[in-house]
Amino acid sequence: MAVSASPLGLEYVITAAKQRTGLSDFGDDSFRAPLKILLEALVEQADLNEAGTQGQSARIIEILCQRLLVQNFFNKYPEILTEEILNPVVIVGLPRTGTTMLHRALGSDQRFYTSRWFETRFPSPPTDWDFTGEDPRLSVAKAEIRGMLDANPDLAAMHPFDAEAAD
């Protein structure tokens, strides 16, 4: 199977993301070569069944959609790139070592701003949102978490999922 003709082909996923968002500016194209390598590896080495192929394709298309939305946001609000973040605190650690709890503890202090799960999962607000009312990303994130936990209730024991909490 030719990579370009499959759901894991570079042009397939890029075209799908453009069609889904109605956007076409990905910004810097440096992501394309590594993405092509990933897609080729998924086709040639991952031994995916049809569900796995469709799942990986959907995941990559969603990531590309987020890239398009973020670039669109930068294009609409270029002043974002001039914002200065003074004294950032970055939390890095291995899984299951308490990094989420540390993030949430620091986030409870008003001197810090922490990105919430839904903001991390969907970094750019929708292009048509006027910044009044509830952020539309929140309901999508809550539904996604609900779906993950419904599909695998054991996830709740591994990670404290909360769309509105720091993560």
Model-derived regions, located:
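Post-Walker A helix-loop "phosphate-sensing" segment adjacent to the P-loop in P-loop NTPases
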Residues: S108-F118
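Generic internal hydrophobic packing segments that stabilize the cores of diverse globular domains
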Residues: S57, I61, L86-P88, T99, ...
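Phosphate-binding P-loop
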Residues: E79-L86
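PAPS-dependent sulfation machinery
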Residues: E119-D167
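Long, basic/Gly/Ser/Thr-rich N-terminal segments
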Residues: M1-P78
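Glycine-rich phosphate-binding P-loop
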Residues: V90-Q110
